[in-house]
Amino acid sequence: MAPNITSAPTGVLFEGDTIGPAAKDQQAEVNAPEAKKPREPYRRQIVWRNVILFIYLHLAALYGAYLAFTSAKIATTIFAIILYQVSGVGITGGAHRLWAHRSYKAKWPLRVILMLCNTLAFQNHIYEWARDHRVHHKFSETDADPHNATRGFFFSHVGWLLVRKHPDVKEKGKGIDMHDLEQDKIVMFQKKYYLILMPIVCFLIPTTIPVYMWNETWSNAWFVATLFRYTFTLNMTWLVNSAAHMWGSQPYDKYINPAENLGVALGAMGEGWHNYHHVFPWDYKAAELGNYRANFTTAFIDFFARIGWAYDLKTVPVSMIQRRVERTGDGSHEVWGWGDKDMPQEDIDGAVIEKRKTQ
């Protein structure tokens, strides 16, 4: 029930209280067609400004990749790779695991660092990113999912950014509880000044540093360190929404689309273990195993946990994982070898044992 709404008499006289039964029936007939009016079917509305922008970004990124191998200084290419890692952490460790899922807590110095890293990534401010991601998890693979993977690879990868949001996305987004982010002064500071911070952090600084620090050309700095880096980071993030919802194993829940995808995990800094993540979205590792090689974000969080800047790290006990694997998994859960309690009986029965020991 909404606040301040009760069934007790209030003393307020509404229009319906002043008319007789006959008039009420007549009024109901007038209002009935409006109440029963069918909902208009959703019609995709292309945002041509975004289409043109993303075409330019990808053409510029291809040119930037060419320059990285032909004329750009090695320092510029290395700088672009570092910025990709830094901005990626702003999404994975910041907007995603910290603010969208609250899988751990961070002291203000770390939150400031993650906010700046997130601004470098330029994927909307933290507040909007987290809200849309919470909607994605609560209404995954439905019309209320901002990047509904059932609408195809292209839509879930980038197409969702080229059209107006489905009405269900907007409607469900309004019902998402965002009070925790609204109380975070760092998040709200970024939201308020985003249109000032983002151009400076994402475009201006990455372009000027190579020019003034190691005498790079403006063209190489712009196309390699800025546009190639930015567009590459975007696509790595998008692969989580597209590829990781289509291809891979489902050891934790075979009834949902998200899957375990090593390639995506490597490119998206640990976000490719997506079947696990959708089953246990509150685990700060976003994976069952804390393998740093395929989950750089977990290494980042663990480092700051050691120095006390990250704390209250939430994870899942082995027993809970095992119960879920047995109940809904597809049988692809990893085993360490012969005799592992997770080894399927059909594998045991079908195995061939050669050179058996004789008495």
UniProtKB/Swiss-Prot annotation:
It is found in: Membrane. Its EC number is 1.14.19.1. Fe cation 2 binds at H136, H245, H274, H278. GO terms for biological process: unsaturated fatty acid biosynthetic process. The keyword Transmembrane applies. Disulfide bonds: none annotated. GO terms for cellular component: endoplasmic reticulum membrane. It is a multi-pass membrane protein. Expected to bind 2 Fe(2+) ions per subunit. A motif (Histidine box-1) lies at residues 96-101. It catalyses: octadecanoyl-CoA + 2 Fe(II)-[cytochrome b5] + O2 + 2 H(+) = (9Z)-octadecenoyl-CoA + 2 Fe(III)-[cytochrome b5] + 2 H2O; hexadecanoyl-CoA + 2 Fe(II)-[cytochrome b5] + O2 + 2 H(+) = (9Z)-hexadecenoyl-CoA + 2 Fe(III)-[cytochrome b5] + 2 H2O. A motif (Histidine box-2) lies at residues 133-137. Its main location: membrane. Fe cation 1 binds at H96, H101, H133, H137, H277. The chain crosses the membrane at residues 51-71, 74-94, 194-214, 222-244. A motif (Histidine box-3) lies at residues 274-278. Its cofactor is Fe(2+). The histidine box domains may contain the active site and/or be involved in metal ion binding. Belongs to the fatty acid desaturase type 1 family. This is Acyl-CoA Delta-9 desaturase. It comes from Acheta domesticus.
